[in-house]
Amino acid sequence: MRVLAAMSGGVDSAVAAARAVDAGHEVVGVHMALNRSPGTLRTGSRGCCTIEDALDARRAADLLGIPFYVWDLSEDFVEDVVADFVAEYAAGRTPNPCVRCNERIKFAALLDKGIALGFDAVATGHYARVVTGPDGRAELHRAADAAKDQSYVLAVLDADQVAHAMFPLGDAPTKAEVRAEAERRGLPVASKPDSHDICFIPDGDTRGFLADKLGEVPGEVVDESGEVLGTHTGTYGYTVGQRKGLGISRPAADGRPRYVLSIEPVRRTVTVGPAERLSVGALEAVEAVWNADAPVGPVEVHVQVRAHGEPVPAVAELTGPADDPVLRVRLRTPLSGVAPGQTVAVYRGTRVLGSATISGTTPLS
């Protein structure tokens, strides 16, 4: 099998490429140049997609003895990930750029280009598993290492994308074992730290990044009765469930902390309230993508709304017209701080069935 190994310059993608080579595949390494921002076009910068990362990926490919290329996908990335990120925050929603990158870059732009060049699959360093089901179709499952499982950010893949995906680290028992394997192989990135930042915001200042893009859009911070508690310079600086940096000029009368309950960018208001008002008993989601058969009628599933969140039992049902359905989810266990724009991933056991983008929630009380 001809395999295109996406090599980010980190330890996971390097070991994944090595395992693909060991499996007897014809492997070609490719590093995606995604970002041209000044913060990433220097060595030693944080995040990923830096020049240093490209050099590390090349060193790993050289050690493995595989061809290596750098593909410039920066225009796709800016349009499909960065611009989308800014637009979503401007609309009062909370996007996950890693989900969008997997959907539109790694398993769309990269995969499409790879297939056009005669490759059969794209291999990445994600912690997830592709399993052949009883019907012969490829199924997406959680990784063996629950602590590192990344199936949530891959839940946006459709059935064809899953069929062309390869995750060689899916059966790795722990990340420590992956690092130990990299050390045994002599890979130069064996001890390289993991990246935890949004790659196009290497300093971690999301609010500052958005302010540069959107400018000041002043408004009010209010309680549920509409009483003004403070002011803000842009609703994009807030997300549902946020506690710190609210811009409240005085404490609540009961002395309890306040959290962001909702964001209304048109009215330029941020509504805050007590923690119990964050509890959600149901949610609605749109733009569903299924890599399994779409659920028919109410079905018992588990859902997850954050990359490292706990899955909770729920009843899911598709409603509305077939060409534009709404996924309605009734939670068996309430969740807290669920924001529009987040991805809800749907599971049956360890299998990922699909995902959708949360458009609204129903408070528990």
From Swiss-Prot:
It catalyses: S-sulfanyl-L-cysteinyl-[protein] + uridine(34) in tRNA + AH2 + ATP = 2-thiouridine(34) in tRNA + L-cysteinyl-[protein] + A + AMP + diphosphate + H(+). InterPro entries: MnmA-like (IPR004506), MnmA-like_C (IPR046885), MnmA-like_central (IPR046884), MnmA-like_central_sf (IPR023382), Rossmann-like_a/b/a_fold (IPR014729). Its main location: cytoplasm. It is an enzyme of class 2 (transferase). GO terms for molecular function: ATP binding; tRNA binding; tRNA-uridine 2-sulfurtransferase activity. ATP binds at residues 6-13, 32, 125. Gene3D superfamilies: Adenine nucleotide alpha hydrolases-like domains (2.30.30.280), HUPs (3.40.50.620), Translation factors (2.40.30.10). Pfam families: tRNA_Me_trans, tRNA_Me_trans_C, tRNA_Me_trans_M. One of its GO terms (biological process) is tRNA wobble position uridine thiolation. GO terms for cellular component: cytoplasm. It is found in: Cytoplasm. CDD domains: MnmA_TRMU-like. Residues 148-150 are annotated as: Interaction with tRNA. Disulfide bonds join 101-199. The record marks 126, 342 as: Interaction with tRNA. The active site is at 101 (nucleophile), 199 (cysteine persulfide intermediate). Its EC number is 2.8.1.13. Keywords: ATP-binding, Cytoplasm, Disulfide bond, Nucleotide-binding, RNA-binding, Transferase, tRNA processing, tRNA-binding. Signal peptide: none annotated. Catalyzes the 2-thiolation of uridine at the wobble position (U34) of tRNA, leading to the formation of s(2)U34. PANTHER family: MITOCHONDRIAL TRNA-SPECIFIC 2-THIOURIDYLASE 1, TRNA 5-METHYLAMINOMETHYL-2-THIOURIDYLATE -METHYLTRANSFERASE. Belongs to the MnmA/TRMU family. This is tRNA-specific 2-thiouridylase MnmA. It comes from Kineococcus radiotolerans (strain ATCC BAA-149 / DSM 14245 / SRS30216).
